[in-house]
Each structure stands twice: as C-alpha cells, then as structure tokens.
Amino acid sequence: MLKEKNLKWLSLFTTVLMLFVQIGGALVTKTGSADGCGSSWPLCHGKFVPTHIPKETLIELAHRGVSGLALLSVTWLVILSIKYIGHKKETKFLCYMSIGFIFAQALIGAAAVMWQQNGFVLALHFGISLISFSAVFLLTLLIFEVDQKFDATKLILQPKLRRHTIGLTSFIYFVIYSGALVRHEKASLACSSWPLCRKGAFILPQNFYEWVQMSHRTLAFILFIWLTYVAFHAMRNYAQYRVIKYGYMIAFILICLQVTTGALTIFTAVNLYIALLHALFITLLFGLLCYFILLISRAK
C-alpha cells in the first residue's frame, strides 16, 4: 500500500515537472534566452557555474535544471511503473514513449544550443516534449486508475466519435508545430491585427513571416471549429458517460482559452504571461485528447 502511494506521489511530481519543462521551453524562446549559455552544453559558457549570470543565462540554466530533474524523475517513474503496474496493457508502451521522447527532447535541445538549428527543426523540440508530457500524464492517470473511477471501461463509442477524436489529436499536433514555428521564426508580431493580418484588409500574406503567422491562424481556426463541433456532438450524444461529457466540455473550454490567449498575444504585443498561458492551455488540451485516444482503445 505504501509503495502504491509513493508511486502516485512520484507520478504527480513527474507530471508537474514535465509541465514546467513545457512552460520553461516557451519562456526560453519568448525571452530570447536560448543563447543564455552560449554554445556550451551541458556546461554554461564552458563552466559548471558561470561567473556572470544575466537574466537570459538564469532562465536557460533554470530550464536545463528542470529538464534534467524531469529526466531523472521520468526514468525512476518508468522503472517503478513497470515493476508495480506492468500487468496493465498500456503501461510498457507509455513507459517507452515517456523515456524515449524525453531523451529525444534533450538531444534536440542540446543540438539547438551547440549547432544553432533553424526554426523548422527547433519547432520539433516543443512537439517532441509534448508527446513525452502526454505519455507521462497518461501513465499518471493509469497509476491513479482514473478509468475505474469514471466507469470508462463500460464505454460504447460509435465510429463517428472515434474517427473525429483520432483526427483531432493528429491535426492538433500540426497546429502546435505551426505555433512553435511562429515563435522560433520570430513571427509573433508579423501581423498587426487579428483575426486578419491587416485590419479590414482581406489580402494574402506579403512575406515569409506573415505566411508563418497566418498559416498558424488558419490551422487554429479549423481546429476551433472542428473541436467545437465534436465537443457538442459528444456532450449531446454521450451524456450518460461522465468521462466523455465532462472531458469534452473541458476540451471546449481549453480551446476557447487557447484562441483568446492567441488573440491577446497580438493585442498585448506578446505579453510574456499571456504567451506562457497560450503554451499551457495547448499542452493541457493535447494531453486531454491523448486521454480520449486511450479511452477509445478500451471502449467497445
């Protein structure tokens, strides 16, 4: 019983850590702190503790520290999960996903520091860390046996909801990548208005940065319409299943918050707190959609 309780605490701690890794990565990009330690990795300016620590260096060091702690925590969680709940069919798959993608995340992060990758490669960093977070999040739900609490094993889902959920989860990943590309290509303020690029002018983007920005907005708009439709379909037709009804209700709230913070990012000239909330909401939404995929795999 004590071991089970300790595993639950470890899984919660690791999930929160992974969330901080996500937000920390966004903070590094938004504050221009990616070069805070120069081209040195894992050292900072060639030293274990640099003598001069400006704000950018402090942010980069903090992100590296949290990422390193998360790597250790995920490794320990994976070992204990296989030992104590390895009999559950999803455990090993989620463990391999958690550990594999956090190592991939670390390697891409190191490569970005040492060899100055372009924006298209750097955008993968956020996406890969998102998969690792989602795997840890699902592993935590598995440890807490959330499915049993919501009677999720008794779900009967029609092919329509299954197809839409899988499609949404795949599509949102491309939306997230396009958003990360906006950050890394420094195209956040390429358009001065919202939702159009120029106020009152419905014209095509005029340069690369506007194309990056408007491509992300277009994909985000499609995602909003699609998820809204699926959420109301699920709440109307699956009201007897709390996990579906309230799960999609939360998903709808998160996508509304995501769109709102996206617009506010433009209106506030990329306010740091708004930008970090924007990254937080999409992380939570992606994790929730991945949970729906887990439910689909168990439903009749």
Curated annotation (Swiss-Prot):
Which positions are catalytic residues? 60
Q: Where in the cell is it found?
A: Cell membrane
The topology of this chain with respect to the membrane is: Multi-pass membrane protein
Pathways involved = Porphyrin-containing compound metabolism; heme A biosynthesis; heme A from heme O: step 1/1
TM ranges: 9-29, 65-85, 93-113, 124-144, 164-184, 219-239, 250-270, 276-296
What are the BP-aspect GO terms? heme A biosynthetic process
Q: Which organism is it from?
A: Macrococcus caseolyticus (strain JCSC5402) (Macrococcoides caseolyticum)
E.C. number, please? 1.17.99.9
Where does it primarily localize? membrane
Give the GO cellular component terms, alphabetically. Answer: plasma membrane
Q: Which family does it belong to?
A: Belongs to the COX15/CtaA family. Type 1 subfamily.
Q: Which InterPro entries match?
A: COX15/CtaA_fam (IPR003780), COX15/CtaA_HemeA_synthase (IPR050450), HemeA_Synthase_type1 (IPR023755)
User: Residues that bind heme b, according to the entry?
Assistant: 216, 278
Q: Which domain of life is it from?
A: Bacteria
Q: What is this protein called?
A: Heme A synthase
The record's note on its domains: The N-half (TM1-TM4) and C-half (TM5-TM8) domains are connected by an intracellular loop. Each domain is formed from four-helix bundles and they align in a pseudo twofold symmetry manner. The N-half domain is the substrate-heme O binding domain and the C-half domain is the cofactor heme B binding domain.
- Cytoplasmic face of the membrane: 1-8, 86-92, 145-163, 240-249, 297-300
Q: What does this protein do?
A: Catalyzes the conversion of heme O to heme A by two successive hydroxylations of the methyl group at C8. The first hydroxylation forms heme I, the second hydroxylation results in an unstable dihydroxymethyl group, which spontaneously dehydrates, resulting in the formyl group of heme A.
Give ranges for the Extracellular compartment. Answer: 30-64, 114-123, 185-218, 271-275
> GO terms for molecular function, please?
metal ion binding; oxidoreductase activity, acting on NAD(P)H, heme protein as acceptor
Q: What reaction(s) does this enzyme catalyze?
A: Fe(II)-heme o + 2 A + H2O = Fe(II)-heme a + 2 AH2
Could you say which cofactors this protein requires? Answer: heme b
Q: List the disulfide bonds.
A: 37-44, 191-197
User: Cross-referenced HAMAP family, in alphabetical order?
Assistant: HemeA_synth_type1 (MF_01664)
What does the entry list as the binding residues for heme o?
A: 63, 125
